[in-house]
Amino acid sequence: MGIDKGVRVLSELNIRIAGIFLVFMIILGPTLYIFDGFVQNTGYYLQNVIRLGFWTENYQQTDWQNNWTVFYWAWWISWSPFVGMFIARISRGRKVREFILGVLIIPSLLTFLWLSAFGGSGLYIELQGVAEIGGAVQENVATALFVLLEQFPWSFVSSSVGVILVIFFFVTSSDSGSLVVDSITSGGKLDAPVGQRIFWANAEGAVAAVLLLGGGLSALQTAAITTGLPFAFVLIIMCYSLYRGLNEEYDRELTLVQERDKKSYESTIRRIIQRQKKQEEEVNN
């Protein structure tokens, strides 16, 4: 259905439900504890993001770097081709500062708040001895969310909303990826044939299903991050291209401004000269 009729409607509905879910957790959970954690977590991230980015565990082998930093870097690098193209497509016509605000800053802050709300609530319940959230996470990460929601009122409703959100997040990501692959295979056309789009969506789902059935979630994750390393070199080239593109755009805008200022200056000089000539003619007459 495309961006306007399909992805946009589904994404907006997804965001609304996620927002309601977040507010639900903040209000019914330990509100003050969540906001304190949000401030502290954000500050801790800003203080340590560079340090941990260069941390190689040379003196203490805990596998934390491999299981978190390296894994998620490779994970997001493998997602970057279609995510970047999709964001670029929906951001067409936006200013650079609007793009940075809407794609980097606001989503990052919302992510901090989301993790502080749900993670903070889980930690609070664990520390108060109400329930063993940590044990539930170690036993089965996929069901730990529902163990957390059971500690709050309307657990059946909130658990149902959680399942719906998981489905919507997956469908939104899959739909966006299929849309980008469809655009690439059609030579960059914005409106490719619907049948081709359906084919790529089904193919994407079939590949994911085969990997899940054949090797479980780990096989699917391995297949996703395998493309991370080779595409990292492509990203370096893309970063350089972006740098050159921004410089060329700046030079072009600077040239246009200089030409406009020059024309304005010349026009002002002509008006002054014409005014002086007119005054001289009046004096002579």
Show where each model-derived region lies.
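Membrane-interface alpha-helices at helix entry/exit sites of multi-pass transporters
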Residues: 96-102, 187-200
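Short, Lys/Arg-enriched, Gly/Pro-containing loop segments at transmembrane-helix junctions
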Residues: 124-128, 246-258
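Hydrophobic alpha-helical transmembrane segments in multi-pass integral membrane proteins
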Residues: 25-34, 116, 206-215, 269-276
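Re-entrant/interfacial helical elements at transmembrane boundaries that shape
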Residues: 10, 104, 178-184
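Hydrophobic alpha-helical segments of multi-pass membrane transport proteins
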Residues: 18-29, 110-120, 161-179, 200-204, ...
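Long, low-complexity, intrinsically disordered cytosolic termini of multi-pass membrane proteins
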Residues: 256-285
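Extracellular/periplasmic helix-loop-helix junctions in multi-pass membrane proteins
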Residues: 211-226
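Membrane-embedded translocation segments of transport machinery
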Residues: 1-94, 101, 106-159, 167
